[in-house]
Amino acid sequence: LADGGTNISSESTTDYIAGYTICNDWSARDLQREEMAMNLGPAKGKDFATSFGPYMVTPDELETAWGDDGKLHLRMTCHVNDILISDGNTNDLYHPFEKMIERASMNTKLLPGDYLGSGTVGTGCILELRPENTNGWIKKGDIVRLEVERLGVLENKIV
């Protein structure tokens, strides 16, 4: 975020966006499964793995990527060990960025420099794609490469 605030209305959120980058939150589905069994929804955060990068692109650099539908249209692919397992687009995100910022700031102070994750781009989750269709869960030694059009490539090795 470029600026901070509380209870930011969706109509003014564009002034708060410093830029866009790729984020892999390395969801811990085992922890999430335990929470879902309690009917609480996935609420438990983790502080051991999130990857960002390789750089941040400012909003003016993406002006032509916005569609008439008000959504950002950027292709996203995911490869594991050079095998394509996912091909999606940011226009498949359920909530628009403006609503995400509005919700995140509801009764909460957001600060300049905070990062907000948009959630998974359609087809971007091994759980939803089914592990049997993606060569299984990621494991030690695997190389995961996320590429988002105009945002670059984020590649990480599982250690």
Give residue spans per PLM region.
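Glycine-enriched loop-and-adjacent helix/strand subsegments that border the catalytic/binding cleft
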Residues: 1-101, 107
